[in-house]
């Protein structure tokens, strides 16, 4: 599939796009929710850290004039995220609101507009209430749509990877189609057919467990 890990240039492009949108909306900082799951692990955290969450909840603090910081409900995974190099200030703890609060310069942000990303379905209700209570900032706005619109506009690297992924899917289906008579003649089971297809995907770097549901 010719997959290439995105470098720091890709990170900078994404960060610049987000900060441009923040500036247009007079938002000083974003607090972004992340939830590790098969479906949502590809979301906000992956976009900002290039690290796929399989479990754990987290928050990213993304100011317009400083490097972002991150808290996660696993210190070990937080350390792995920092080693990836996109967000370096990472720490773990079960009380996300408290952990993030300890990283902030409250005096600096007291009179600033803060945007929350993921308040509807990503950030747990208790964590969200804890944040509102601790921050005590009047000018908090919902910034989920803002972030989603930025994320929807794909970079050159993202477009290439999407194209590569679809080409891999196409090639895999053609391989199955070309061998379907042989599968029938050899009385191969559905499990054996899926295994043959998965071998192709694994050899090309596909590691998503959803493959096994095919």
Where are these regions (language model features)?
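N-terminal accessory/capping or targeting/presequence segment of soluble
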Residues: 1-102, 167
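Flexible, acidic/His-enriched mid-domain "rim/lid" segments that flank
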Residues: 1-3, 9-15, 95-209
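Long, charged, glycine-rich C-terminal linkers/tails
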Residues: 210-214
């Amino acid at each position: 599939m010719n997959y290439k890990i995105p470098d720091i240039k890709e990170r900078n492009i994404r960060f610049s796009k987000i900060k441009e949108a923040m500036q247009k909306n007079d938002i000083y900082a974003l607090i972004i929710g992340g939830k590790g799951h098969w479906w949502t692990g590809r979301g906000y955290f992956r976009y900002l850290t290039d690290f796929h969450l399989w479990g754990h909840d987290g928050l990213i603090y993304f100011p317009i004039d400083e490097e972002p910081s991150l808290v996660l409900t696993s210190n070990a995974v937080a350390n792995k995220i920092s080693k990836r190099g996109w967000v370096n200030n990472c720490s773990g703890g079960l009380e996300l609101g408290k952990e993030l609060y300890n990283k902030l310069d409250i005096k600096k942000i007291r009179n600033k507009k803060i945007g929350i990303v993921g308040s509807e379905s990503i950030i747990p209700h208790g964590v969200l209430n804890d944040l509102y209570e601790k921050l005590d900032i009047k000018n908090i706005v919902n910034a989920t749509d803002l972030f989603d619109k930025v994320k929807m506009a794909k970079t050159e690297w993202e477009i290439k990877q999407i194209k590569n992924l679809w080409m891999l899917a196409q090639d895999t289906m053609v391989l199955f189609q070309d061998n379907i008579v042989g599968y029938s003649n050899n009385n191969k089971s559905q499990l054996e057919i899926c295994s043959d297809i998965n071998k192709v995907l694994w050899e090309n770097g596909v590691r998503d467990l959803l493959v096994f549901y095919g």
